[in-house]
Amino acid sequence: MNQKILLLIKVVEEQIEEMVKDNEDVELLKTIPGVGKIGAATIASYTEDLERFDGDFKRFAAYIGIVPSVHNSNETVHLGHITKHGPQELRTAFVQVALGMIRLSKQTSNWRLIEDYRRKKTEKGSGRAIIALTRKIARIVFVMLENREPFNPELMLSK
């Protein structure tokens, strides 16, 4: 890669790190395996005011754009693709966290989340499985930020 581009990336990463160095939300988010400083900063910047969701995860998921679109016809309800409403950067950050967790399979292989992902991948395909995992991670993040608690890997273990 071009040296100037690498230098520019490094400068931008340092600026981001300086901006969020005292941010409690970023530190909480970095306790999740697969979440780096850029992902944590992105998620924290878009979720500063969780009170606007009134403790309702469904509203939070709709804000991110990871809920299925709904098509009604008389008494039939069809669920379609995710809505993709909301900030694309935030949705991308959550998907990147999901992909990071999948990559960390040595550390996360016995987690229910990853087991559910693998099962859903064989049943429905990788795209749907990643979105399902993303939604579960978003729920974890929502609860963590609401309760001001770090990530607890003990809660993820299969029983």
Predicted regions, residues:
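Phosphate-backbone recognition surface of nucleic-acid-processing proteins
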Residues: L28-T31, K37, A41-T122, S126
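Extended, structured, electrostatic nucleic-acid-contact surfaces
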Residues: K10-G34, I43-Y46
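A residue-level signal for conserved active-site and pocket-lining positions in enzyme catalytic cores
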Residues: I5, F94, I137
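Low-complexity, acidic/Ser/Thr- and charged residue-rich accessory regions of DNA metabolism proteins
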Residues: E75, E115-K159
